[in-house]
């Protein structure tokens, strides 16, 4: 919907950020830091609650984003990832990072944004977005309405960080829907760890997905999975716990949940089909899950959300100085993420090939890999190909090289976590 009526300058804010997750928090920080009058609206009554993900962030992400994360939001410093294949073969991807208390991390981001001058409205859900054009039929600003006492809000630009549902994609009909996967987890206790995140590629417990054990201090851990079988997800998770060393270990409510309620899993849906076809339109930029930005193999999204929120804010700040918030002007954002993010089509191709392998084929491939997957030399990669050729040449016809490339592009330096 469009209108020729312009808002009063006194009522106008520069940027409205929709959603207070990691993408929204990052966008708010960098918009406010650029001197823009910034407002954030969050549909939920609290920032960071409920938690939707495994809560991990690599040290490389922290460095890439120039973050100084306070200790109180960290649940554990970790060494990297251990991938466990169907026959029990284990391979390490050693790259340091953190398990976060994600609700505290997101609250810290919004506190940082507030310190810089951003305003936060909780319990505010966007239900309509109306573009306003000037007398020359050029985009001028937005009138954004919804449920909440501070609506309507007039703004020059909007950053959609509303998660996989993508408020603006639905309200503005910005293209195709994204494919999603279900992710759920329990918080458990009495779970020992050696500082690695455990990712189990065990299809019997997580069809077209994987199971994880993400450790926290105090012998706590997030134990969860992602699977394309949304209806059966919790049943698969319960079965995995029952059949492994986790059987009998206590399940507890996470810190952010009312401790008087019955213990139950938490999570949600995650985009897995790659970026949306359209991430920019006149006056609006999509970031994080709203843009379809997750690493497709292991569904890591926080690094991508934080980076895209920062980039969106910087592009909009520049566009406001030139008084040009057209799609053509904001396409600098799309050019930036396409240049910086990994080749999604290659990761998706490898992921498809991975889940076409039988358990035996997956394990055979794993036994051909070095014990440490980080920083493999070209000579080592050649050796892997030769081992596969000797042990099970049929694997080469099953696009196993694409699988290995997908693993490589899921590392922290490629925004994997």
Which functions belong to the PLM regions below?
Residues 58-110:
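A conserved beta-strand/loop capping segment in the N-terminal third of enzymes
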Residues 6-21:
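Beta1/beta-strand and adjacent pyrophosphate-binding region of the FAD-binding site
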Residues 24-25:
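N-terminal Rossmann-fold NAD(P) dinucleotide-binding loop
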Residues 34, 112-255, 271, 276, ...:
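Predominantly flavin-linked oxidoreductase catalytic cores and closely associated redox partners
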Residues 317-417:
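C-terminal helical "tail/cap" subdomain of flavin- and related membrane-associated enzymes
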Residues 20, 32-51:
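Glycine-rich FAD pyrophosphate-binding loop
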Residues 19, 161-162, 287:
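Short, well-ordered coil/turn residues at beta-beta hairpins
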Residues 99, 125-128, 231-315, 320-321, ...:
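FAD/FMN-dependent oxidoreductases across multiple families
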């Amino acid at each position: 919907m469009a209108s020729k009526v312009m808002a009063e300058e006194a009522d106008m804010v520069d940027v409205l950020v929709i959603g207070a997750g990691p993408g929204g928090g990052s966008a708010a920080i960098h918009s406010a830091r650029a001197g823009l009058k910034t407002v954030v609206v969050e549909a939920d009554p609290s920032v960071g609650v409920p938690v939707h993900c495994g809560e991990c962030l690599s040290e490389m992400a922290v460095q890439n984003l120039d973050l100084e994360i306070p200790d109180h939001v960290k649940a554990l410093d970790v060494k990297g990832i251990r991938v466990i294949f169907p026959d029990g073969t284990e391979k390490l991807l050693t790259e340091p990072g953190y398990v976060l208390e994600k609700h505290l991390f997101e609250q810290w981001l919004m506190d940082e944004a507030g310190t810089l001058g951003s305003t936060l409205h909780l319990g505010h859900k966007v239900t309509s977005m109306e573009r306003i054009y000037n007398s020359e039929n050029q985009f001028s600003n937005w009138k954004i309405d919804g449920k909440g006492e501070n609506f309507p809000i007039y703004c020059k630009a909007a950053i959609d960080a509303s998660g996989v549902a993508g408020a603006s994609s639905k309200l503005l009909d910005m293209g195709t829907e994204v494919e999603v996967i279900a992710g759920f987890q329990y918080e458990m206790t009495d779970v020992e760890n050696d500082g690695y995140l455990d990712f189990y590629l065990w299809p019997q417990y997580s069809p077209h997905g994987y199971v994880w054990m993400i450790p926290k201090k105090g012998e706590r851990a997030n134990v969860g999975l992602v699977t394309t079988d949304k209806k059966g997800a919790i049943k698969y998770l319960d079965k995995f716990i029952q059949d492994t060393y986790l059987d009998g270990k206590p399940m507890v409510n996470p810190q952010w949940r009312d401790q008087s309620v019955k213990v139950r899993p938490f999570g949600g849906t995650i985009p897995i089909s790659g970026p949306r076809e359209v991430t920019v339109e006149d006056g609006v930029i999509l970031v994080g899950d709203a843009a379809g930005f997750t690493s497709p193999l292991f569904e890591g999204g926080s690094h991508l959300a934080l980076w895209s929120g920062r980039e969106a804010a910087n592009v909009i700040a520049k566009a406001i100085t030139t008084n040009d918030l057209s799609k053509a002007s904001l396409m600098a954002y799309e050019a930036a993420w396409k240049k910086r993010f990994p080749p999604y089509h290659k990761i998706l191709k490898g992921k498809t090939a991975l889940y076409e392998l039988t358990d035996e084929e997956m394990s055979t491939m794993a036994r051909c890999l070095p014990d440490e997957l980080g920083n493999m030399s070209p000579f080592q990669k050649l050796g892997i190909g030769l081992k596969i050729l000797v042990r099970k040449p049929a694997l080469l016809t099953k696009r196993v090289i694409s699988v290995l490339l997908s693993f490589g592009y899921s590392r922290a330096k490629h925004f994997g976590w």
